[in-house]
């Protein structure tokens, strides 16, 4: 049963003190002794701790509090007085600490009513499942399943199920949970159906964190269930160290075509890193998908500059042009220097099959973009950059020519030769774009 503080005391506190926001409520998780200690204090007075960093009261928001379920068995709902002259609040990792708190309610974490209360707060289902798993509470899990379990695929749940345990409650809980989580598989063809059931054998499963390492292997993302609760089936699995699991048999319950823009938004909502999604669309020349991501999601300056590098080496003019406009707009929102992580050698090693190593160390971001654009082989991209960086192309002519020879791009070699001979000397440098690239000098390690 939920433990409630005397409402008369709460009313007195509300009348006597102001709050940062009377509608703002904070939470923390504590053990039984902590609850006893709090109730032994006079609740009509603020609870005071002199050493906040060491002894202060930690609290956080409702969306974060279940990250701390290992701290105890009780959920405290509390508020903080705002205008008490002795109040001190400091920010700490994942929350705050204060020398004063005012308690509203205490909930037992193993109670189904507490679980329902947290569910109504729209807490992430993965966190709610972690709470249910702490107590191996099938009633909580059933409640969540009835409401429509929405979980991000995570290979940890397969590992938990496959771990041998002597606790039958734990085995049943893990089996029920695993049978309800849709995992992901990437394939080039859609599976057929047998008596209305789509069964797939010998499948490599992945989770949301590792999905985009697999996308080059197909154009469909399958959602599959592992039939671990069917006693007439013997499911075989094999784990590796690269975020993949081989499973002998699964049921396909849905699929998405990667040509459909909406699947990318769905995967980001599931927890896919939006930068991984953006790089995938650039490398696979999905222009409309790239435009959608740039329009609907926020990328920081370093992410945009790295994306521009990949667009240059991919040789797609339309994608490159779209990104370069976004990068120019982002430049004026921050004075942040360009990251030394944008390293030419690193990009060439990971993104390009470079046949020969050239001893060359770029000094500006422009140098990197020019080299990558030449490797990408798009004459249109070089022509776009020409009106901004004519002099830089002249200065880098010899190194750019070496790269064009390595990649046997005759059109690129002819263009660079004509630029060097002055055939395009009437191009004027655009100072705005010039400042975007050249004020950011790279820090390179020799």
Swiss-Prot record:
What SUPFAM superfamilies does the record point to? Ankyrin repeat
What superkingdom heads the lineage?
Viruses
Alphabetized InterPro entries for the sequence: Ankyrin_rpt-contain_sf
Keyword 4Fe-4S tagged: no
Keyword check for Transcription, yes or no: no
UniProt keyword terms in alphabetical order? ANK repeat, Repeat
What are the ANK repeat spans here? 71-100, 124-153, 206-237, 245-277, 303-332, 365-394
Entry's transmembrane regions: none
Instruction: Specify the protein name.
Output: Putative ankyrin repeat protein L273
Query: From which source organism is this entry?
Result: Acanthamoeba polyphaga mimivirus
């Amino acid at each position: 049963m939920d433990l409630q503080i005397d409402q008369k005391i709460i009313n007195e506190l509300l009348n006597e003190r102001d709050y940062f926001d009377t509608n703002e409520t904070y939470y923390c998780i504590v053990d039984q002794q902590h609850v006893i200690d709090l109730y032994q204090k006079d609740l009509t007075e603020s609870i005071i701790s002199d050493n906040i960093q060491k002894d202060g009261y930690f609290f956080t928001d409702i969306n974060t509090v279940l990250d701390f379920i290992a701290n105890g068995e009780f959920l405290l709902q509390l508020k903080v007085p705002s205008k008490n002259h002795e109040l001190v609040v400091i920010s700490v990792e994942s929350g705050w600490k204060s020398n004063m708190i005012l308690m509203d309610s205490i909930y037992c974490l193993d109670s189904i009513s507490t679980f329902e209360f947290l569910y109504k707060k729209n807490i992430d289902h993965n966190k709610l499942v972690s709470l249910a798993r702490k107590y191996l509470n099938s009633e909580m899990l059933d409640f969540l399943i009835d409401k429509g379990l929405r979980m991000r695929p995570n290979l940890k749940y397969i590992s938990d199920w496959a771990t041998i345990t002597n606790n039958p409650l734990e085995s049943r809980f893990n089996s029920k949970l695993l049978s309800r989580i849709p995992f992901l598989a990437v394939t080039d063809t859609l599976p057929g159906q047998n008596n209305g059931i789509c069964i797939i054998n010998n499948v490599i499963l992945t989770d949301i964190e590792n999905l985009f390492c697999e996308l080059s292997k197909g154009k469909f993302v399958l959602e599959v269930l592992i039939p671990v609760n069917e006693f007439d089936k013997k499911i075989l699995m094999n784990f590796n160290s690269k975020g993949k699991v081989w499973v002998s048999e699964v049921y396909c319950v849905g699929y998405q075509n990667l040509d459909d823009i909406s699947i990318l938004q769905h995967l980001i909502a599931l927890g896919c890193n939006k930068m991984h999604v953006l790089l995938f669309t650039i490398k696979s020349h999905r222009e409309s998908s790239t435009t959608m991501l740039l329009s609907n999601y926020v990328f920081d300056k370093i992410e945009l500059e790295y994306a521009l590098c990949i667009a240059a080496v991919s040789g797609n003019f339309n994608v490159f042009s779209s990104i370069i406009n976004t990068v120019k707009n982002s430049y004026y929102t921050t004075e942040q220097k360009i990251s030394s992580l944008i390293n030419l050698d690193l990009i060439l090693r990971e993104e390009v099959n470079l046949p020969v190593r050239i001893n060359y160390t770029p000094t500006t971001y422009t140098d990197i973009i020019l080299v990558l654009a030449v490797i990408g082989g798009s004459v249109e991209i070089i022509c776009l950059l020409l009106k901004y960086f004519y002099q830089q192309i002249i200065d880098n002519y010899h190194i750019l020519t070496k790269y064009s020879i390595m990649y046997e791009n005759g059109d690129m070699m002819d263009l660079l030769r004509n630029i060097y001979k002055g055939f395009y000397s009437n191009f004027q440098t655009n100072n705005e774009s010039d400042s975007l690239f050249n004020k950011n000098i790279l820090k390179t390690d020799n």
